[in-house]
């Protein structure tokens, strides 16, 4: 099983030695200008109702560019040399440096002092920092948190400048109701009347099977859908599995059909050849085994991707949710489709629950298609001044780091999940 890991396209030594500003601030300078940065007013991480794609977010991000330009002009911050797993109760000289680092971006009140003790104030500051960077807010200093802390201030400034340009490209009318999929954040937002209605953790495309940036329309919800296995998965996964376990298809409710639509029994196929690639493999409905779970959300587009439920709910609690073959898995999918179908006659929450309970194949075309924007935003801010950063997981920022604090994926507990990742 893979654990959380950090991988950099540039070495850690290069980050520390070559990328930081030549003049880093002293502790006194940091504390002095941090008073003007109003860190104390923003120690907590509020739940903003401002959509990532909105005029308000654009204006806030433009303002944050100026703030980070000021940070850079004042010398940025020192690289943090600290052991991983520092937590409440620890005493270490690195905690003093950690306090100074958190003060600069407003995650810790300067009044918290310069003690080498990792107290509850430092823990709260670390949690706030982690939340702003898409990390699990444990309050413990781990490798991923240290890597994010050590991204140089000029890099963060460039990241903000790049994303202002991206946000401006969405400055037109996006619609009365729309959906945002922010790929680097692995996050889905439903937006209505300019406010976020719901937020959902998501599973998005792997680094080598990227989710596309696109604008499209959601047209229908398929309940208890079939899943047609892609040809690449038949070749790479199903054939080897059947060679090892002839009962595999039956146990996973996967059926074989000829081009004429005739069902073929598994024992009729020569699994020691490529004969299987000539057939269609279809997994029966059933949220417990079907790779799309109980729901597929149709989005006609040239990439052949869609949104769906998943039987692998555990991914939503992980930092690293770049696990699919390009499609987007949605947490709390019932809340999501209830919102999608709210203006479609006869599709209230009660009816949706009845369809789930019945387990029957049912399609629900939306009476009004909903716009959906799959976007790539790695830095943005809210009007309250809270700035968010995410790893440049697909290396679209071009700042020299594929993922500055990438959290490695957790291998599926069930090995059969590995091939059912859409």
Whereabouts are the PLM-identified features?
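N-terminal secretory signal peptides and thylakoid transit peptides that target proteins
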Residues: 1-14
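A short acidic/small-residue loop/turn micro-motif
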Residues: 15-18, 204-205
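Proline-rich low-complexity regions
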Residues: 18-19, 212
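Sec/Tat signal peptide C-region and signal peptidase I cleavage site
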Residues: 20-24
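Well-ordered beta-sheet/strand-loop patches within structured domains
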Residues: 25-110, 114-132, 136, 143-422
